[in-house]
Design a protein with these regions (language model features):
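Intramembrane alpha-helical segments
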Residues: 84-89, 155-242, 327
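Helix-coil boundary and interhelical linker segments in multi-pass alpha-helical membrane proteins
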Residues: 106-124, 181-193, 231-249, 301-310, ...
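The first (N-terminal) embedded transmembrane alpha-helix
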Residues: 90-109, 224
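Multi-pass membrane catalytic core of lipid/isoprenoid biosynthesis enzymes
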Residues: 143-192, 196, 276-309
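Acidic (Asp/Glu-rich) catalytic motifs at the cytosolic membrane interface
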Residues: 127-155, 255-279
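Membrane-embedded alpha-helical segments that form the functional core of polytopic membrane enzymes
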Residues: 102-141, 193-204, 242-261
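Extended hydrophobic alpha-helices typical of membrane-associated regions
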Residues: 310-375
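Small-residue-rich segments of transmembrane alpha-helices in multi-pass membrane proteins
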Residues: 101-105, 221-236, 280-284, 341-355
Length: 375
């Protein structure tokens, strides 16, 4: 048999080292020809088992046999496409979609979701194209820092792109804005140009390489007021009244405490990358107490100006939680990756409940003052 002929080509060589004897095998000149005959991996594995059973010969193939997977060109293209799409979705921060949707839907109150094409157009825009612009530029600028961040590379916390993906991202961000800019110009009018100009200014101020506000406290927190542009776009696009100024203040404070919470989770990678944020400057415990203070002000706003006991109660519970976090629970200890994921899932559940409550009651769309405040 051909397999037996292969064995005849092997001759043992015994090498003594101390008390151990190493058994090696040398192939004769025809070994390459025999190896080509043994193209089937199953035959090679069968040969290895026969060699081992004789306890004299050791296979001439050193190391573990590698598994070879043949990928068809069409399948490879599909995999690359799926991988690229997953990366773009991660860039848009699905972990923050519920919060962004809550901001977009807040001015609309009890809107008719089923019959409003404008509503769905704007909702898709703020979740994906706007998310790509806001966070994609940040990912391009923070390439080195994201490599040190264990949160990155997930759908919850954002992307960690390869060099080629990040190089193409800037053009993908610009390309995806074009159809929406045209649609909004048709639906909203020339004022959408001012909206986009303000948005680009905020993105530029935050991410500029030398003087970017993302590394300059307290501007890294104050720039979060730009999220109010979502309120403005929603009202324009859906022909709804703008929210009361107290609701705008609430939105600013909410965006600020959300951002500081993200900075608290990123203290270690930010310090390693040399990035200075409000959380890295004041420390983990003071940052948590700062979040609690912002939530307390939000609670007072909702309680006194909108008289919504449910929203005010949730905000008060959040303020109490961060006080306990800073003083009793975690204190100065960093969150683990599992804890951060649980926190963000809880955050999303709370945001979804807020969306439902706003759709049911719409209390933040109109003032409902106490008699003393009305006077």
């Amino acid at each position: 048999m051909l397999l037996d002929q292969g064995f005849l080509l092997l001759r043992p060589l015994v090498v003594e080292q101390g008390s151990s004897i190493l058994f090696c095998c040398l192939l004769a000149d025809r070994s390459c020809d025999i190896a080509e005959v043994f193209a089937s991996q199953e035959i090679i594995r069968h040969t290895q088992r026969n060699w081992k059973s004789r306890n004299v010969f050791k296979p001439c193939i050193v190391g573990q046999m590698s598994e070879t997977t043949v990928t068809l060109p069409g399948e490879k293209s599909r995999r690359q496409h799926v991988s690229g799409l997953s990366f773009l979705i991660q860039v848009s921060r699905p972990g923050l979609w519920s919060t962004t949707a809550m901001f977009y839907l807040m001015p609309l109150g009890h809107a008719d979701f089923l019959r409003s094409g404008r509503l769905w157009l704007g909702l898709f825009f703020v979740l994906f194209p706007l998310g790509m612009l806001l966070y994609g530029v940040n990912d391009i600028v923070d390439t080195e820092g994201d490599l040190l961040n264990p949160r990155k590379g997930t759908f919850l916390f954002g992307s960690r792109g390869a060099r080629g993906q990040l190089a193409a991202l800037r053009w993908q961000i610009a390309f995806v804005q074009i159809p929406f800019l045209a649609a909004f110009y048709f639906l909203v009018g020339p004022r959408i140009l001012w909206w986009y100009a303000t948005l680009l200014l905020a993105v530029g101020l935050y991410n500029a390489p030398r003087f970017g506000w993302k590394g300059r406290s307290p501007f890294d927190v104050l720039i979060q007021a730009s999220y109010l542009l979502v309120f403005v776009l929603s009202s324009w696009l859906n022909r709804s009244p703008q929210l009361p100024c107290q609701a705008f203040v609430f939105g600013v404070l909410f965006a600020m405490h959300s951002h500081v919470f993200g900075e608290v989770m990123d203290i270690e990678p930010d310090r390693l990358s040399g990035r200075s944020t409000t959380a890295t400057l004041i420390g983990r415990v003071p940052a948590k107490l700062f979040i609690a203070g912002l939530l307390t002000i939000e609670t007072a706003l909702v309680y006194f100006y909108f008289r919504d006991w449910i929203i005010a109660g949730f905000l008060a519970i959040g303020a109490l939680w961060f006080v306990l976090d800073a003083g009793v629970l975690w204190k100065n200890r960093p969150y683990s990756p599992v804890e951060m994921r649980l926190f963000l899932w809880g955050w999303n559940i709370a945001a979804l409940l807020g969306i439902f409550w706003n759709w049911s009651h719409g209390t933040l769309t109109r003032l409902n003052l106490f008699s003393g405040l009305q006077q």
